[in-house]
Amino acid sequence: MVLFFSTRFLFFSIFFPCLISITLYQLDSFEPASLPADSLITSPTSIPPLLNDRFLTGAEFIGVGLLNNPEDIAYHKDSNLIYTGCVDGWVKRVSVHDSANDSIVEDWVNTGGRPLGIAFGLHGEVIVADANKGLLSISDGGKKTELLTDEADGVRFKLTDAVTVADNGVLYFTDASSKYDFYQFIFDFLEGKPHGRVMSFDPTTRATRVLLKDLYFANGISMSPDQTHFVFCETIMRRCSKYYISEERVEVFIQGLPGYPDNIRYDGDGHYWIALISEVTTSWKLSMKYLFLRKLIYMAAKYGVELLSIKNAAVLQVDLDGNPIAMYHDHPFSHITSGVKIGNHLYFGSLLHSYITRLDLLKYPAQKKL
């Protein structure tokens, strides 16, 4: 009797769940692909000489509870306002003051989607890369919202991510994935196939043109100061590349990043700031290498179980040649999606937090590592 009970217990508690799991694994159509060898080099090669690895010690928090996952940050110098897109669909405006406590948050325009990247057009309009809607233009003081484009070459955008504006008015933007939407972006990582594109939109001709395709989660994008090229990031590959506009040529800007890049911003003073949403954790290393692990993680994620660790996010400062200069991070802080330098402060956007984080770079500078 005891033996029968033990056998039945083992069957229902161990063997039966394993049998169900194996069956589900085999039936699921999700098939991850091997990643390029470059993405499997987990040791970072772009290490900055200066570091602040305790930036939360001096951090200030702006709009606590009023900014729901402010993913990107765009600063409008003339009005002294920050524009940011939140998960509830609002593009919000935040006043910039010496004291973080004096900042005022305004619900400006709700796109009805998920606003991510933000840039400013030549005629006062605010350009929004809305993950759900496509590329939008907000004008007339927020009274008019216009869809500029939501497809190219017959393929609709699934995750319109970031946008930058050239001096001639042409918009350059990314569609991170043509297969998975914003709420499924982790599946794009796990599948390991290049669904990303970089495109241009000409406001004069209204033409949308695909400049690059087959990218591994095309993310942040920023025009160069000399307007000859833009820099864009591929999150999965942990690299950023230059695209020379007139030559239609690509070259690596920086690779072997110490984390996964999100947005990139030029500060007008000879530097780019690259947000790294997470360091390369052990779970990321293993999943990128082993296909069966990625499928298991995918199946768990389908049922709301998160197995990938995202932590120790950062913002990396690099020069115009892609040489790393300084990095700001803090181990408990994750999901940094943008870093923007405004005056002497560095502002951090996030996919996780309900505020914008700010650090005084003069009081809390990055220093040489011992």
From Swiss-Prot:
Keywords: Glycoprotein, Phosphoprotein, Signal, Vacuole
Localization of this protein: Vacuole
Signal peptide: 1-21
Lineage: Eukaryota, Viridiplantae, Streptophyta, Embryophyta, Tracheophyta
Tree of life domain: Eukaryota
Induction entry: First induced but later repressed transiently by jasmonic acid (MJ). Slight induction after wounding, both in local and systemic tissues.
One family name in Pfam for this protein: SSL_N
Glycosylation sites: 101
GO cellular component: cytosol; vacuole
Mitochondrion found in the keyword field: no
UniProt similarity note: Belongs to the strictosidine synthase family.
Gene Ontology process terms (BP): response to jasmonic acid; response to wounding
Gene3D superfamilies found in the cross-reference section: TolB, C-terminal domain (2.120.10.30)
Coiled coil: none
Protein's name according to its UniProt entry: Protein STRICTOSIDINE SYNTHASE-LIKE 4
Keyword Glycoprotein: yes
InterPro entries with a match to the protein in the record: 6-blade_b-propeller_TolB-like, Strictosidine_synth_cons-reg
Gene: SSL4
Phosphotyrosine, modified sites: 303
